[in-house]
Curated annotation (Swiss-Prot):
Pfam families: Foamy_virus_ENV. Residues 570-592 are annotated as: Fusion peptide. Envelope glycoproteins are synthesized as an inactive precursor that is processed by host furin or a furin-like protease to yield a functional hetero-oligomeric complex. The transmembrane protein and the surface protein are N-glycosylated. Residues 1-65, 976-982 are cytoplasmic. The mature envelope protein consists of a trimer of SU-TM heterodimers. The N-terminus of leader peptide specifically interacts with Gag protein. This specific interaction between Gag protein and Env glycoprotein may allow particle egress. It comes from the Viruses. The surface protein (SU) attaches the virus to the host cell by binding to the cell receptor. This interaction triggers the refolding of TM and is thought to activate its fusogenic potential by unmasking its fusion peptide. The transmembrane protein (TM) acts as a class I viral fusion protein. Under the current model, the protein has at least 3 conformational states: pre-fusion native state, pre-hairpin intermediate state, and post-fusion hairpin state. During viral and target cell membrane fusion, the coiled coil regions (heptad repeats) assume a trimer-of-hairpins structure, positioning the fusion peptide in close proximity to the C-terminal region of the ectodomain. The formation of this structure appears to drive apposition and subsequent fusion of viral and target cell membranes. Keywords: Cleavage on pair of basic residues, Glycoprotein, Host endoplasmic reticulum, Host membrane, Isopeptide bond, Membrane, Signal-anchor, Transmembrane, Transmembrane helix, Ubl conjugation, Viral envelope protein, Virion. This is Envelope glycoprotein gp130. InterPro entries: Foamy_env.
Amino acid sequence: MAPPMNLQQWLLWKKMNETHLALENISSLTEEQKQQVIIEIQQEEVIPTRMDRVKYLAYACCATSTRVMCWLFLICVLLIIVFVSCFVTVARIQWNRDINVFGPVIDWNVTHQATYQQLKAARLTRSLKVEHPHISYISINMSSIPQGVMYTPHPEPIILKERVLGISQVLMINSENIANVANLSQETKVLLTDMINEELQDLSNQMIDFELPLGDPRDQDQYIHHKCYQEFAHCYLVKYKKPSPWISEGIIVDQCPLPRIHDPNYYKYQPIWDYYLKIQNIRPQGWTSKSYYGTARMGSFYIPTFLRNNTVSHVLFCSDQLYGKWYNIENNIQENEQLLKTKLYNLTTYSKLKARALPKEWNNQGNARLFRSFNPLDVCNRPEAVLLLNTTYFTYSLWEGDCNYTTALIQNLTECRQPDRLKLKHPYACRFWRYKEGQEEVKCLGNEKKKCLYYSEYSSPEAQFDFGFLSYLNAFPGLKYIENQTVREPEYEVYSLYMECMNSAEKYGIDSVLFALKTFLNFTGTPVNEMSTARAFVGLTDPKFPPTYPNITKEQKRCNNLKRRKRSTNIEKLRSMGYSLTGAVQTLSQISDINDERLQQGVSLLRDHVVTLMEAALHDITIMEGMLAIQHVHTHLNHLKTILLMRKIDWTFIKSNWIKEQLQKTEDEMKIIRRTAKSLVYYVTQTSSSTTATSWEIGIYYEITIPKHIYLNNWQVINIGHLVESAGHLTLIRVKHPYEVINKECTYEQYLHLEDCISQDYVICDTVQIVSPCGNSTTTSDCPVTAEKVKEPYVQVSALKNGSYLVLTSRTDCSIPAYVPSIVTVNETVKCFGVEFHKPLYSESKVSFEPQVPHLKLRLPHLVGIIANLQNLEIEVTSTQESIKDQIERAKSQLLRLDIHEGDFPAWIQQLASATRDVWPAAARALQGIGNVLSNTAQGIFGTTVSILSYAKPILIGIGVILLIAFLFKIVSWLPGKKKRN
């Protein structure tokens, strides 16, 4: 293709073209003349005018086919931009008209509208009898829901939290104390020990150990008291003035019943029976009682050598059976604990008991303020105590020959002068228990030397096992011989191991004191505190008391450089488990309220760890047999473990009376407090262990919620909403109520907004606000109204607990209205909306709703469906008290964004047609036709093209402007820059 002509060439071409046109119209010139004229004109110099330059510019713009095509493309682009801009401008004008039109009105003042629909139920009657067919009808009862909100009973009480009390409890469990209370034998002690170890080891395997930022409980006075009391409450050390053993090898105490020849025994087991010398008829040749038992008579009681040791200078015992009448067994353990603690603090100097605490037999200045004197029957049940501690020897003998008493002397007694009458009164009257039968000897038959016949000096008394006991009780007249002999001087010094533990713990620490005193109790190899309380009496030879306390360093659970990290880790453990404990200062601030005088007594308790002995919390098990007592303890222990694993509180082991008294709470509030309290085990430790005894400690943290107000009759809000068909879109309208629960006490209704709530049996909230319900008046709340696009068809059916159904649907079936939420109750099974509706357990004729809500009339924006469709999520479109003007402004902010269109072009045109239908019907029909053509007729080709252009409209406008500027510069570049000179 030839390049475009320059200005001189174009002027020459133009002049030659004009010359040819002029010569064609002149016929007077010949061809040669015409050629001559053309040559002359070509040789003439042409000077362009302004008009020539303008014409040349037009020529230069369209000189080639490429330039022509560019101009055509530019014109097409400009036409498209103008078309789209004009169309959007017209649409915007239409949007403004649609926005200013009032939208639909929802009047939620209709309640309890009942509609009955009778449907013929298909029924096939099969019967052998002739029956007339009958038609049954299904009744559907419907009631509309005001404001699209359903209220259902809220069964859980709602508790407004006033404060939280944090309590740490250390629960001590000592099997030996429990065994002593229940009078268990050594065999059953092993079973009790195994049971406690099994339960607490299982609890320990499921709990992690960590520390509370409340201090070590071992430094606490209450802990020290309970620990010392649990281990050494009834332990004492008695010091003789000088070592004095028992004066004889045998002892005659006929007031004690004897074991029967055949079991079972009539009387319960007597400890002195362990020392009984039973007369056996078979003995080896040459056997004599003197060679084995010394001066002790066969048929009496033999005192073993360990009770007759000449070097015994002290007596160590752990028993509560020597206390006076002040220690009443009918009192509970806690009452006796307080009494003993008071007595010891008043009757001791450091750890030594004052003289007035002892009986006269122990000290000449004694007044029996703490211990009592021995009675004659004590030797039967507490033989070691009598033999080691008694200062005198009382012989109660019914043996023939003692004190020169004979049969003739008995018959001369005043009460025995009529023997025939006395025998009718009692068979034991006026006779000896043991008669003298001759010298002791063993007779053998033939060569038999091992199994010979033994003849005792006195008769065998087992057949009359209760002779002496009945004689002591004066059950019959007869001889009573009592002999009193001095054994020791009554100048005892008595020391309390409990007071020694309490006083030394302040100086040496509880761990060191416990170790030393427990070692002291094990002086003979058998721990005295693990013996039976009736026999826990041992003699010692010059023991060192007080013992030497070792320097025991407390176990450090964390390094110093990791102290802060470890502490924060423990607190995080609490936080992760749902507890609000965040430090000692915060805990005490939650617990302590100095301005509340009713709490001041409780504050001192809560600042320290609460220490509890398990045996003090149990029922009275002294009347139970061994296995029954173990089962009782097992039941309590298993229940405690189960409750702790459930993070609840076993109120058997911690009393709540102080909360009720100090906080002035009612019994109903106390029930809430007990139910909502939480527990957390923070350590389980076995402190001691042996074959027959074990002791454990359980550290438990409690959080006790103190209620400020309790809301009982509550209704829960179910916001189902209301359906609206707007601008071709199905929209779900909801009112955002400011409350979640309605409380109705008597006839007074309260609308409650709950914050920071946890569900733990009851609903416990930090904040409960009383708000106003939604309404159109100024006395009610202005609630936001939201719209959400939903798909057609919309069917929501929810079964209610009363047997009815909550229905919200966009279509009608079984005469159930569309768009309006309804409560539906049927009397027979019927299928609606593809769902089977079943009748309730009983027939309901009317569905009542409580409480009632105020009147609410709501106007929605005209294009609420368009707004919800644009946002594609639930948005606020108005409020219950918003003015029409504000509503229109809100709608404009949402709808005018369509000026810069986003989306499929045919769909947008159809949406515009739907929005215009009720405002400008003719335009709506035209737009609908265009949308149908673009989406259907042209199979989307043209529509897609236009849609792409619509998406790129801002880009195309920018490109068009850039092209115009570029073409202008290009056109300017085509113009000649310099004039040609001839």
